[in-house]
Regions:
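Short, solvent-exposed recognition patches
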Residues: 24, 32-34, 183-288, 298
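N-terminal mature ectodomain segment of secretory-pathway/periplasmic proteins
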Residues: 1-73, 98-147
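Extended beta-strand-rich segments in extracellular/periplasmic secretory proteins, especially
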Residues: 90-147, 179-187, 191-232
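Residue-level signal for well-ordered, solvent-exposed loop/turn and beta-edge residues enriched
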Residues: 74, 113, 138-140, 152, ...
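A generic structural motif
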Residues: 49, 72, 121, 147-148, ...
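Surface-exposed amphipathic alpha-helical segments
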Residues: 138-140, 147-171, 286-310
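Acidic/charged, solvent-exposed loop-and-adjacent secondary-structure segments enriched in E/D, K/R, S/T
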Residues: 67-88
Length: 310
């Protein structure tokens, strides 16, 4: 059932309305969008809420996304990250099943449809990490809930309505003409050979010597953050992810809109932010600036941080 759910968008075409809720310790966010998806890999999201996104849309064509910003009259073009493809391919599915137990909860109904409920529990911690509501007939995930390490609901994404149909015109997935095209964040060609990426970073980069049980390398690349050449290393256990960013400058990742708390990484000053299931931890040592971003508890990120430069 789980593998069927992962593969469902590759052969199902549909339209619908989706609501997403992200629950953070400092703020919560909600969004509503219409979606048109044409199998195997064309989709478009039309945002209805919040007001700041109303009228904007995102077109996905294979691995390329076009974010249409109507207020700025521009289209931001970017390549999908591996983070967006977690458990979407067979190798990631193998990682997931080696780290999580999938069990059935009592069936439910959605808009007259029978729904199978699958609960994913981490084999090492015993914690429930994800809960999926899957259309029993088509295999499509109709609702997804993600839980933080403390057991609190961190994210909920669900269809408010859905219609399966192949009558979706290809013109919906065409990028509007006349708008300015802008390249998204600059990133190098990603590689799953992380040691090679570290060696080619252009500065004395480091990788973690410790990872929580079940986490494996996914990919690494060099990105441009605030004009600073930054090495990005990504690890995953099939559901949760952790990213290590490092550079010669002081380009923080994602701290701008949050109030950070001070802490220590071994003998170095550090700061962290908790936002729902995601934790950010930043520190500097040996002339480098590091930021860890992961769906892990602070104690786990601190262990990873301490292992980067033992």
């Amino acid at each position: 059932m789980l593998h069927t759910a992962i593969e469902a968008p590759h052969h199902l075409s549909y339209t619908g309305e989706i609501q997403t809720l992200n629950f953070g310790s400092q703020k919560s966010e909600a969004a509503i969008y219409r979606i048109e998806h044409r199998a195997p890999n064309l989709s478009r999201r039309w945002y209805l809420a919040p007001q700041s996104l109303y009228g904007d849309s995102v077109i996905s064509r294979g691995e390329t996304t076009y974010s249409i910003d109507v207020k700025r009259d521009r289209v931001v073009v970017a390549q999908d990250d591996a983070i967006d493809d977690q458990v979407a391919e067979d190798d990631n599915f193998a990682v997931l099943t080696s780290n999580y137990n999938a069990t059935f909860a009592p069936d439910e109904t959605f808009d007259g449809r029978n729904v199978r409920v699958v609960v994913l529990t981490n084999k090492f911690t015993g914690e429930m990490t994800m809960r999926l509501h899957i259309d029993a007939q088509t295999g499509l995930v109709l609702e997804k809930q993600i839980y933080a390490a403390n057991g609190a609901l961190a994210m909920q994404e669900r269809f408010e309505d859905i219609h399966y149909t192949a009558a979706i015109p290809t013109g919906l997935f065409e990028v509007p003409k006349g708008m300015k095209l802008v390249n998204g964040p600059s990133r190098g060609l990603p590689s799953n050979d992380l040691q090679h990426v570290i060696a080619a970073a252009g500065f004395p980069a480091h990788g973690p010597k410790y990872l929580p049980e079940g986490f494996e390398p996914v990919e690494g690349d060099v990105v441009d953050i605030k004009g600073v050449r930054t090495l990005h290393l990504l690890y995953s256990d099939g559901i949760r992810t952790v990213s290590l960013f490092q550079n010669h400058g002081n380009a923080d990742v994602g701290f701008e809109n949050y109030k950070a708390t001070t802490t220590r990484v071994e003998n170095h000053d550090a700061k962290y932010v908790e936002d729902g299931s995601t934790m950010l931890l930043a520190w500097s040592e040996s002339g480098l600036h590091f930021t860890l971003v992961g769906e892990l508890a602070l104690s786990e990120l601190e262990k990873i941080a301490a292992s980067v430069i033992p």
